[in-house]
């Protein structure tokens, strides 16, 4: 009996997906010593103690059974209260809210619930690496919208209009942005919303970094704009703002008909998000906002330190007002982002992420995360400054 070779065994769609440029680079880092890594987008803070304590308590009390597919009712109520308080949009916790395994699952579910084969999904780049693969797996056609540094990597209505075709169905709106740290203010969102309404586009608004904005720029959701709540899925979670990456808990809110279909897919693929994490998240939303503010204050201190360091070494970098990343430009050195990152790693043992890992428009930039201590950032900037001087021949 003949056996299939590996190529025949694996679907063509899966084979077409490229491995994450971030993970590929950090597989190399894992084999090296004395590396200061600024590449991972994960808070360096411990999960707030009250959240951990609730997790321990629920385990001790044996609260380890399935929840409803959509998640604990009490958690969904708290999520909807939180969103009403933070973005001033009201949702029905019973029909318009779904608890997911991280925000990433919510992205996947939304695309699978909305897409018919051949529909186009607009993806502003540079961006988080999962949108395009998830669109492909949902049988959509991802269409990149290259964002520009001169616009502070914000999406303009003209850029959006330019990429709309009769097949366009969904716009992914990833702000505050990973990797650039860009934010969209209300005026920006109103202009984008006007285009979405004119062309009947649905929006996936990935707001996972909504709690991490600086210098008084409060996060604004496109769901706040008149006419947009009924055509927007708001995606968020606990990983970034509450330092709960390993708890794997996210959520989405939107129109009941779409959330219902997403819940159906979630039911068959996942059943429910981790029960222990759900109980802990109730405590996070109810009791731990003070810790979120403290973490945000610390991130802002680090952000300002890095911007000052780049100015000192003459490395161009627009000021990011969200997330915990900076995206300096390295075009002056006449090498690709990957070449720059590789040489920096080899010569100075500093790990950053090449900008093109987040899309072609990220070429010529590197992503640096400031979810690290000031001591680590100081050491990294000393090494980076030395590396830049060497490239300039000084």
Annotate each predicted stretch with a short phrase.
Residues 65-66, 209:
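Intrinsically disordered, tyrosine-centered linear signaling motifs in cytosolic regions
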Residues 62:
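Conserved nucleotide-sugar phosphate-binding/catalytic loop shared by glycosyltransferases and other
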């Amino acid at each position: 009996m003949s056996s299939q070779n590996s190529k025949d065994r694996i679907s063509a769609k899966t084979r077409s997906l490229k491995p994450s440029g971030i993970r590929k680079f950090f597989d190399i880092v894992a084999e090296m010593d004395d590396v200061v890594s600024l590449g991972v987008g994960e808070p360096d803070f411990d999960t707030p103690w009250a959240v951990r304590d609730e997790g321990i308590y629920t385990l001790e009390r044996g609260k380890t059974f399935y929840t409803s597919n959509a998640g604990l009712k009490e958690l969904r109520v708290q999520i909807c209260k939180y969103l009403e308080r933070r973005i001033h949009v009201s949702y029905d916790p019973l029909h318009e809210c779904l608890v997911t395994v991280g925000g990433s699952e919510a992205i996947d579910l939304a695309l699978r619930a909305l897409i018919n084969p051949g529909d186009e999904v607009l993806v502003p780049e540079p961006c988080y690496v999962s949108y395009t693969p998830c669109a492909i797996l949902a049988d959509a056609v991802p269409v990149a919208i290259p964002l520009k540094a001169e616009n502070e990597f914000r999406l303009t209505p003209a850029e959006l209009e330019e990429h709309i075709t009769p097949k366009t169905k969904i716009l992914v709106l990833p702000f505050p942005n990973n990797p650039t740290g860009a934010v969209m203010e209300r005026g920006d969102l109103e202009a984008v919303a006007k285009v979405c309404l004119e062309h009947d586009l649905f929006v996936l608004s990935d707001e996972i970094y909504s709690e991490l904005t600086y210098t008084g720029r409060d996060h604004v959701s496109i769901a706040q704009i008149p006419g947009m709540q009924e055509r927007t899925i708001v995606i968020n979670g606990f990983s970034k703002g509450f330092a709960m990456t390993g708890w794997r808990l996210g959520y989405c809110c939107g129109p009941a008909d779409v959330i219902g279909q997403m819940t159906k897919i979630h039911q068959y693929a996942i059943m429910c998000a981790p029960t222990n994490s759900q109980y802990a998240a109730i405590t996070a939303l109810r009791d731990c906002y003070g810790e979120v503010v403290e973490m945000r204050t610390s991130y802002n201190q680090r952000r300002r330190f890095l911007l000052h360091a780049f100015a000192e070494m003459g490395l161009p970098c627009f000021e990011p007002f969200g997330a915990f990343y900076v995206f300096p430009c390295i075009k002056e050195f006449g090498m690709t982002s990957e070449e720059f990152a590789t040489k920096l790693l080899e010569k100075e043992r500093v790990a950053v992420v090449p900008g093109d890992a987040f899309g072609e428009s990220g070429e010529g930039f590197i992503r640096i995360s400031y979810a690290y201590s000031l001591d680590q950032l100081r050491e990294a900037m000393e090494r980076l400054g030395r590396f830049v001087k060497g490239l300039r021949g000084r």
